[in-house]
Amino acid sequence: MGKKRIVFFACLLLFTVLLRFSYAGITTESPLSVEQTLSSSNGIYELGFFSPNNSQNLYVGIWFKGIIPRVVVWVANRETPTTDTSANLAISSNGSLLLFNGKHGVVWSIGENFASNGSRAELTDNGNLVVIDNASGRTLWESFEHFGDTMLPFSSLMYNLATGEKRVLTSWKTDTDPSPGVFVGQITPQVPSQVLIMRGSTRYYRTGPWAKTRFTGIPLMDDTYASPFSLQQDANGSGFFTYFDRSFKLSRIIISSEGSMKRFRHNGTDWELSYMAPANSCDIYGVCGPFGLCIVSVPLKCKCLKGFVPHSTEEWKRGNWTGGCARLTELHCQGNSTGKDVNIFHPVTNVKLPDFYEYESSVDAEECHQSCLHNCSCLAFAYIHGIGCLIWNQNLMDAVQFSAGGEILSIRLAHSELGGNKRNKIIVASTVSLSLFVILTSAAFGFWRYRVKHKAYTLKDAWRNDLKSKEVPGLEFFEMNTIQTATNNFSLSNKLGQGGFGSVYKGKLQDGKEIAVKQLSSSSGQGKEEFMNEIVLISKLQHRNLVRVLGCCIEGEEKLLIYEFMLNKSLDTFVFDARKKLEVDWPKRFDIVQGIARGLLYLHRDSRLKVIHRDLKVSNILLDEKMNPKISDFGLARMYEGTQCQDKTRRVVGTLGYMSPEYAWTGVFSEKSDIYSFGVLLLEIIIGEKISRFSYGEEGKTLLAYAWESWGETKGIDLLDQDLADSCRPLEVGRCVQIGLLCVQHQPADRPNTLELLAMLTTTSDLPSPKQPTFVVHSRDDESSLSKDLFTVNEMTQSMILGR
C-alpha cells in the first residue's frame, strides 16, 4: 500500500511539473494561470507571469527558456501590472486575448475583437506570440507587431505613411521596471531609411542612411560585413527593417533604459555583446552643432567644416559646441555657370553623413555633382556605393569623422575659399576669333550629326539583314519611339529590375499588350554576337517553362529585347524578401522547382540542339500570373549539335557561387554545369537565403557547407525557412535537400543528368548518398563575378548558334 501511495504522489508531481512547464496553448477553455507557462515547440522561448526584482507586481512576458538570469524579451501589460495571484491570460468569447485580474476585471487586452468562431494563442519558435483563428488558421494578432524593448530574429521595425502605422522599440523605464521609458528606436521614412533613437522628442542617436547591406554611419559595417539586417522601402510610403541572425541560435537587439542599442548573442554559456551604440561621445546626436564635425578621439574634439568658423568662440572655448559653426564667406549662386562667383565643392573624407539628406534617383556621380551645383539651395552632396546620390538642402547636422571607414561628403563653398582672395585670371578673346570659333563649331557639329544619323541607319539595316539571314520566324522589329512610348521614356516607375546585361522595364503597347523591355547597357560587355545569340535562341526555343521573346529594337548603339511580360517578376523577389516569401509556401516552391527542371530538360535533351544556359540562378527565373516559372536571360547560353556533350572556353562567364568547379577553374562546361547551378538554386529556394550573402556561425560557413552539415545531422529537414514550416512536408523537404547536394558534388560524373534529376523530383525512388561538396565560394557582394586572367565576366567569345 505504501509503495502504491508513493507511485501515486510521484505521478501527481510529474503531472504538476508537466502542467507548469509544458502548457500547450491558450484558449477560452484553457487560460494561462500565474503558475503555468507556455513554451514554443522548439523549447527556446517561454511565456508566463514574472515579477521583476522580486517585486509584488506581476507581468505577462516572454523570455528565453532555461537561461539564467532570466532575459525578458516582451511584456504584455508593461503599463498595467497586477498584484493578484489569481490573474490569468485567456481568450475571450469574441476571440480577443485578455489578461484578467480576479478582482478587478480586465487588466490588459490586445485591443481588438474578432468575428471568429474560436481562436487560440500560441508561442511560435521565433518567440512571436500569435492569436490564430481556429477555422482558417489565419493569424489575427501577433506580438511581433507590438514591440517592447527587444527585436528578435525575423521581426521588423516598420512605418507606413499612408496609415500612420509604426513599429518601434521602446525602452524600459529602468532595468527592473518594464513600463515605457524615454528612449524610442525607429526607422525613419527617409529614402534610404536610417535607425533613429529618440529621447522624448529629441534626437539622440542615428545610424546614418542604409546602403544595401550596411549603415553608412557605423564604420564596422564595411563591405566585408555579413549583415543580419534587411531593409525594404516602396513607393507607397512604407518600409520594413528586418533583423535576421542565422549564425546564432539565440540573439536579440534591445534598446536599454539608458538609450543604448545593443546586440547580444548567446554562445551557449553567456550573452556576448557584439555591438552597442552610441559607442562614443561623437555618436550622441548633434554634439558639435550645425556645420560642426566631431572627431572620434579621446577626449571628444569638435571642429568646424572647411569654410566655417565657430558660431560663438566663447562657448567653444568652454567646451559647449552645440551652437555649431557659421559660414565664413557667403555664397553667391546664380546657376554657377562661369565667373568669379562660381561655387566649388570641398571633399571631406571618412565621414558619417549628416542628417536630413534627400535622395536623388537615377543619376550617376557626375550628374549628382551637377545637380547640386545648379541648385542654389544644395549645401552638400555625396555619391554612395549601394545608395547613389544624396544631397543636403538643410544645415549639415551630426557629421562625424572616423579614423577609417565612412563616406566622402562634398560641401559647397565660395570659390574664394579654394585659394584665398587671389584675383582670377581673365581670358579675353577677340570678337572675330569668337565668331570664327562658333561658326567652325556649328559646321563640325552639323557634319557629326549627319555621320551619326547615317551610321545609325546603316547599323540598323545591317542588324536586320543579319537576323533575316538566320531565318527567325515571327520576330518583330519595333521602332524606338514605339518602345519609348510604351515604357514612358524608360521612366524609373516602369523599371522592373536589373538583368544580366542591363535594365528591364515594363511597357504597354498601343493595343494594350504588356511587354518587358531589356535595355542592354553599353558597358555590359554584350556585343553583337551575344545579342544575336539571345534573339535567335529564345525565338526558336518554345516551352512553357522558357520565357518568350516577341521582338527586338536596334537604334544606333541602342539594343533592346522585347519579351512577354511576367506579372510576378523574378523568383528572387519572393524567396529573398522578408514579407513576400510568405506568399510562396513550400508546395508552391516545390512546383516551381519541378517547372525549372522541366525547362532545363527541354534545353538539355528535348530540343534538336543541346543548350547549356551557363547562368542559371534565382534572379533568372521569371514568374507569370499563375506563378509558373520560366527560365530567362539566354545571353550566355551555348548550343551544340549531335553527340557533343561538353565544350571549353577561355572566357568563363556566369555568376559567382552558381558556377561549377570544372567550369570556373578550367572553362569546361556541359549539361552538368547547369545541374550544379540548379543544385545551388534549389538549396537557396529551400533556405530562403542568397548564396553570395549567406554566412553561418563563427566560422562563416557557406550555404553549401551549412546544407551539408544539416543533411548529416537531420537529413536537411531543418533547413527550410522557419516561416514556411507550417506548409512543409518534411520528407519532401529532406529529399529536395539531398537532391540539391547530389547536384553540387565536385565531380561532374557524380551529378545526375537532367532526366535523372526530373525523375528524382517527381518520384519517390531511392536516392544515392551525396558526396561532400568541395567547391564553395564566399562573397559578400550580390551575384559577384569572377575576374581573373582565365576568367572574363559578362564577356564571351562564341559562334552563332541555331535553335529549333
Swiss-Prot record:
SUPFAM superfamilies: alpha-D-mannose-specific plant lectins, Protein kinase-like (PK-like)
Stretches in topological domain Cytoplasmic: 447-804
Annotated active site: D615
An annotated GO cellular component: plasma membrane
Localization terms from the record: Cell membrane
Single GO MF annotation: calmodulin binding
Glycosylation sites: N53, N94, N117, N134, N236, N267, N320, N336, N375
Annotated signal sequence range: 1-24
Residues carrying Phosphoserine: S524, S539, S619, S632, S692
Positions of the Protein kinase domain: 490-775
Sequence ranges on the Extracellular membrane side: 25-425
Phosphothreonine sites (modified residues): T649
Membrane protein topology class: Single-pass type I membrane protein
PAN domain segment(s): 333-415
Region (CaM-binding): 579-596
Record's catalysed reaction(s): L-seryl-[protein] + ATP = O-phospho-L-seryl-[protein] + ADP + H(+); L-threonyl-[protein] + ATP = O-phospho-L-threonyl-[protein] + ADP + H(+)
Record has Transmembrane helix as a keyword: yes
Pfam families named in the record: B_lectin, DUF3403, PAN_2, PK_Tyr_Ser-Thr, S_locus_glycop
Bulb-type lectin domain sequence ranges: 25-144
Similarity remark: Belongs to the protein kinase superfamily. Ser/Thr protein kinase family.
Protein's recorded name: G-type lectin S-receptor-like serine/threonine-protein kinase At1g61490
